[in-house]
């Protein structure tokens, strides 16, 4: 984890990406690029947005800085303080809770030795509670970085975290082998006819 920088500027690669993002919007509507630019700045800055990065985005878009702060503080996808290398976001909203997210939270607490809003002493893991990650049919689930881990139970959640601890890359997606968001027992409709057509 790093401290707050004194200044922020996009590196050469991200400056080109920022120009391309801004160019997607009509003249006069460049402020619409605020969310992707904040994401780009956050990715460049080890997963969090210091005030200087938000100010830089405001300058690029010709927006008052307060408008950028409003966006960054409203959406939970933006982190306003340093986070660990692996940001473990556990969904505890109703569908995940009904399917056992309390067990996932417990497994994460036990495996990582931290609670929501905390970072491990080695700076490797930050744990956050989220309201909804949009994969309700595959509940319970958690997001780590850009990857979704779905159809979890306490054992699979623990296995994912242990693999990350050892430097491995756990397989994202359903942990029960479910294909995307099909019913857990497999397709019940839209099956091929008996003739194979």
Task: Name each region found by the language model.
Residues 1-197:
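Signature of N-terminal electron-transfer/Fe-S-associated modules in redox systems
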């Amino acid at each position: 984890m790093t401290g707050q920088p004194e200044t922020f500027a996009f590196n050469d690669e991200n400056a080109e990406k920022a120009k391309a993002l801004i160019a997607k919007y009509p003249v006069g509507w460049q402020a619409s690029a605020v969310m992707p630019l904040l994401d780009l700045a956050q990715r460049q800055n080890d997963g969090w947005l210091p005030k200087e990065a938000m100010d830089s985005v405001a300058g690029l878009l010709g927006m008052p800085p307060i408008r950028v702060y409003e966006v960054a503080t409203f959406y939970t996808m933006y982190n306003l303080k340093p986070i660990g290398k692996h940001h473990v976001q556990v969904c505890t909203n109703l569908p995940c809770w009904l399917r056992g997210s309390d067990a996932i939270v417990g497994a994460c607490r036990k495996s990582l030795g931290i609670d929501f809003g905390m970072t491990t002493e080695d700076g490797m893991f930050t744990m956050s509670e989220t309201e909804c990650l949009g994969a309700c049919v595959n509940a319970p689930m958690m997001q780590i970085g850009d990857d979704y881990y779905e159809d979890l139970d306490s054992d699979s959640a623990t296995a994912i975290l242990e693999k990350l601890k050892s430097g491995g890359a756990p397989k994202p997606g359903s942990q029960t082998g479910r294909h995307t968001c099909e019913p857990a027992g497999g397709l019940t409709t839209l099956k091929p006819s008996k003739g194979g057509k």
